[in-house]
A protein has these predicted regions:
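Outer-membrane beta-barrel translocator/receptor signature
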Residues: 167-169, 180-258, 262-268, 316, ...
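Surface-exposed extracellular loop regions of Gram-negative outer-membrane beta-barrel proteins
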Residues: 277-294, 402-406, 475, 498-541, ...
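Conserved C-terminal beta-signal and adjacent last beta-strands/turns
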Residues: 370, 394, 540, 626-735
Length: 735
């Protein structure tokens, strides 16, 4: 059990006091002042990478962030344009597909700490099996899982277990099929985490946080030009040491990320590097009793594993992005990234549960010497030309991806019944060191090469046709064991088309429709069924987009997506295998709104209805897909009081709700995770010192609601629990 809560609270207060004193000193220290030509307001704007229209009497042009050759911009909470959907800088209303953006302002106001936090603002999003909280795992429009390749960084696939960190500027979500431009993906869509890039105006921030759980974090973010050169730099660093909210565990993480940009007359080059070390709890959550259909009646803080349930590792990512403008009509974007993640973990895995006595059967497992590395290359030639008197936005592209995953030593020990959830005693099951030769050397290697083309044809000022196609070639092998046994060995290619149409009723209102296909080769390190057939999908979508009073952007979409040969896991004799369902379908309605209602009042809101079920399968026909919420919703308002009483000090407050409906906990729908709604709020006060000092208090899950975010899907023994009430105090100074 966790000890010394009073001491922890005292330590948290000490962290806050120390941070405030240090930041106040930095704010007042004249030696920290930079070029006098850079005004504080300009520095602040560059730091947030958007311009707040409420900060002055006029609406300023937003700063466009160059993100790996992908241009995109937001204004406060409002998305303006994106390159994720078309790979060229396109207004949202010209895109025949739903696109959502969680801006930097939203992330800062809500103090988002994970991709799940950011995506709680987007419709139709649920959490899937996170492998004990160690991986990003996101369901989009009914489809998705961990390690499914749907989460990109600056438009390129990576080996990162978690893509959201201190380098994140914003999160863009492209709904529906994206295979034509991004390759092997589900029809539910893809997520692009856009990172912060060097800016040509100096700005900086130093911050510290304290959590009510215990511990906190500290970090820096500085960017600006290198005097006398055409270069700009950025340096981001953060150290985090926070107590886990359950009865034992700690999250430790440090990250450093330098980047350098060169701005020539026609060419821009950005080189970036990010290193991260992490140690996080490996926590599979709680048990649901199949007799009652509810979680076991145990304090949610009580864990059923051991203190050695930890995943430790480090990751590195190097990326190079080049943008060259041949002339006003033609631009070449080149991108490359190399990413590497190595990790090891230990866990006391719950294998069975006795509902009458509360006794659980556990097994000491571990994965040691795991590594994943990924190369991703893409080249896009973009043209904006007239052909036959009609405007065409042309895209010719090619890409190559290589991913190699190896889990070296798989450790498996004998099962033991030595733990009771109603009287937990830890330490009776030591970590295991016995290597299972049959399970070790799990390896998957996939390489893909693609060429694609797309045209956005502007027939008139009102009608836009979008069409494209991709040829996708892949080579895939997977297997395990000592000696190694190959269970998957396949290769092939396929054309993947897309088409869409936009009708702009007015410059601020558009209607659209699209149809697209997807293709995903599948593998299994262990399958009773040999080579798995590739997933194939098709999706249809209609919708409308609005810009309201030049401040709010809204999107309404209706869609239906069908997939066949969908992979899912099942347990056979205690081991997990992969098989495929015949056909599944997801249908739904989504509404998203983001932006400014007035100069002072901003909002971001969403609602999604998703009906996802198995249509054709001998075992699960008619069943709901695991972890897919039938209803999702969020609503968050902020109010900026502006300058108070002529003092120069500013106050900003906000509050909102987020929630999801019930979700199937297992493939056979033996139980359901209940729906939930939780409330959050924040207040930020900025003192106008020589450098602005901001104190921000974020309250999460204000009413301390017990809720469950996802299940592992194959059994009732692993269900993630949402965090209880927490308070995070942040002190930051900007330069």
């Amino acid at each position: 059990m966790k000890q010394g809560k009073t001491a922890v609270a005292g330590a948290a207060i000490h962290h806050v006091r120390a941070a405030i004193l240090i930041l106040s000193a930095c704010a007042a220290y004249p030696a920290m002042a930079q070029d006098a030509a850079v005004k504080p307001k300009e520095a602040d704007a560059a730091a947030s990478e958007t311009v707040d229209p409420a900060a002055s009497g006029t609406v300023l042009k937003p700063i466009t962030v160059e993100s790996g050759g992908q241009d995109g911009a937001t204004r406060g909470y409002q998305p303006i344009s994106t390159t994720t959907a078309t790979r060229s800088d396109t207004p949202l209303l010209d895109i025949p597909q739903a696109v959502n953006v969680v801006s930097q302002d939203v992330l800062k106001d809500q103090k988002a700490q994970s991709l799940d936090d950011a995506l709680s603002n987007i419709s139709g999003i649920s959490q899937s099996n996170t492998l004990g909280g160690t991986q990003d795992s996101v369901i989009r429009r009914g489809f998705g899982d961990n390690r499914d390749g749907s989460i990109l960084t600056d438009g390129l696939k990576t080996a990162l277990p978690r893509s959201f960190n201190a380098t994140t500027d914003r999160v863009e979500v492209l709904k529906g099929p994206a295979s034509t431009l991004y390759g092997i993906l589900d029809p539910g869509g893809m997520i692009n985490v856009v990172t912060k890039k060097p800016q040509q105006v100096f700005s900086g921030e130093i911050y510290g946080t304290a959590s009510s759980f215990g511990g906190g974090s500290t970090g820096i973010d500085f960017t600006g030009p290198i005097e006398g050169t055409d270069f700009a730099y950025r340096m981001i660093g953060e150290y985090k040491n926070v107590d886990y909210w359950r009865n034992f565990g700690k999250t430790k993480d440090w990250i450093i990320s330098p980047s350098l940009s060169w701005y020539g007359e026609d060419t821009e080059v950005t080189l970036s590097y990010t290193h991260e070390d992490y140690s996080v709890p490996f926590d599979r959550g709680t048990i649901f009793d199949l007799n009652t259909g509810h979680a076991v009646n145990v304090d949610p803080k009580i864990r059923f594993d051991e203190p050695y349930n930890i995943s430790k590792g480090s990751s590195d990512m190097v990326s190079v992005n080049i943008k060259h403008e041949f002339n006003e009509d033609w631009t070449l974007n080149l991108g490359y990234s190399y990413s590497y993640n190595e990790y090891s973990d230990n866990q006391a895995r719950v294998m069975a549960y006795n509902a009458k006595t509360g006794a659980v059967t556990r097994r000491a497992d571990a994965t040691q010497g795991s590594e994943i590395y990924n190369h991703a290359v893409r080249a896009d030639l973009i043209g904006d030309v007239e052909i036959g008197g009609l405007r065409n936005e042309l895209l010719f592209g090619a890409s190559y991806d290589y991913a190699n995953t190896l889990r070296t030593d798989l450790i498996r020990c004998a099962q033991s019944v030595n733990f009771n959830i109603y009287n937990p005693v830890y330490g009776n099951m030591p970590a295991c060191t016995t290597v299972s030769k049959a399970d070790s050397d799990q390896k998957e290697v996939i390489s893909t090469a693609s060429a694609y083309v797309q045209d956005s044809l502007y027939l008139t000022d009102q009608w836009i046709l979008v069409g494209g196609a991709r040829y996708q070639y892949y080579d895939l092998t997977a297997g395990k064991g000592r000696p190694f046994v190959t269970n998957t060995d396949s290769s092939g290619g396929k054309w993947v088309p897309r088409g869409g149409i936009v009708y702009k009723l007015t410059p601020d209102v558009s209607f659209y429709a699209n149809v697209a296909k997807t293709f995903r080769p599948q593998s299994s390190i262990a399958s009773y069924y040999g080579n798995l057939p590739p997933e194939e999908g098709v999706s249809y979508e209609i919708g409308s987009k609005f810009e309201i009073a030049d401040g709010l952007t809204a999107n309404i979409a209706l869609y239906t997506s069908d997939k066949k040969n969908v992979a899912y896991s099942e347990v056979i004799d205690g081991d997990t295998y992969v098989k495929t369902a015949g056909r599944v379908r997801a249908r739904g309605v989504e509404v998203d709104v983001a932006g400014e209602i007035t100069d002072e009042l901003s909002m971001i809101a969403s609602y999604g209805f998703t009906d996802a079920k198995v249509l054709d399968d001998p075992d699960y026909a008619g069943k709901q897909l695991v972890n897919v919420a039938r209803h999702t919703g969020s609503l968050f308002f902020t109010y900026d009081f502006g300058e108070l009483g002529g003092s120069g000090n500013r106050l900003k407050v906000g509050a909102g709700l987020r929630g999801a409906g019930r979700r199937a906990g297992m493939n056979n729908n033996a139980y359901f995770l209940p729906g939930y709604v939780v409330a959050d709020a924040f207040a930020a006060y900025t003192f106008q010192m020589e450098r602005p000092l901001t104190l921000q208090l974020n309250l999460k899950n204000i009413f301390n609601k017990t809720y469950y975010t996802s299940s592992i899907g194959t059994t009732n023994l692993g269900n993630q629990i949402g965090e209880p009430f927490s308070a995070v105090l942040t002190a930051s100074v900007k330069f």
